[in-house]
């Protein structure tokens, strides 16, 4: 039995984080040898079309990462309407087992946010500042590993205590099977 769970990551929030990260990297890279590093590395509205393409690629990669848990309905929407990724938030519906620990939903959302941001930053840096791209690619791998680990967490089945009121419920209770006194104890 599965329970559907919706996950949504705001494209505007991701792009804001991408802008902050690239501005920081650009500011850090400014030197006498490279005084124009900030203008080259920091993203602007002029880069929107390219960043939208990176957004779609990151969303596709995230969907592949979550493929095992995507509902059939979600997979159809993603495969038949890829243009949704350029203008809208990243939204997926997951089919989770009932024993999945739903307390980790916020952590999955945040790891997915990190995955999307760092995927876009990595692609951008491969174009503008290759020496920093490897560090962000490692962050993408870490986020992917974290998402997978969080998706695989299951709650332990509850244990019945020996003094619980449902002792023997499976066999009709102690009154039907005689209880310990019939076993010679």
Language-model region placement:
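Short conserved catalytic/interaction loops centered on acidic-Pro-aromatic/His motifs
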Residues: 129-139
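Conserved short "hinge" loops at termini or chain/domain junctions
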Residues: 1-105, 139-141, 145-185
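Short, hydrophobic/amphipathic alpha-helical patches that form generic packing surfaces
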Residues: 60, 111-127
């Amino acid at each position: 039995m599965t329970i559907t769970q919706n996950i949504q990551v705001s494209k505007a929030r991701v792009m804001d984080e991408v802008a902050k990260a690239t501005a920081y990297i650009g500011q850090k890279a400014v030197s006498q040898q490279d005084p124009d590093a900030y203008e080259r590395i920091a993203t602007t509205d002029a880069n929107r079309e390219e960043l939208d393409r990176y957004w779609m690629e990151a969303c596709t990669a995230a969907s592949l990462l979550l493929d095992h848990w995507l509902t059939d309905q979600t997979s159809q929407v993603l495969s038949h309407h890829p243009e949704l990724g350029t203008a809208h938030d990243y939204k997926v519906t997951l089919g989770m087992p009932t024993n999945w620990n739903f307390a980790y939903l916020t952590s999955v959302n945040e790891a997915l946010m990190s995955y999307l941001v760092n995927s876009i930053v990595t692609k951008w840096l491969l174009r503008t500042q290759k020496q920093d791209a490897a560090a962000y690619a490692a962050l993408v791998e870490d986020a992917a590993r974290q998402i997978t680990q969080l998706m695989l967490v299951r709650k332990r089945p509850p244990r019945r205590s020996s003094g619980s009121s449902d002792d023997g419920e499976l066999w009709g209770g102690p009154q039907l099977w005689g209880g310990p006194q019939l076993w010679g104890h």
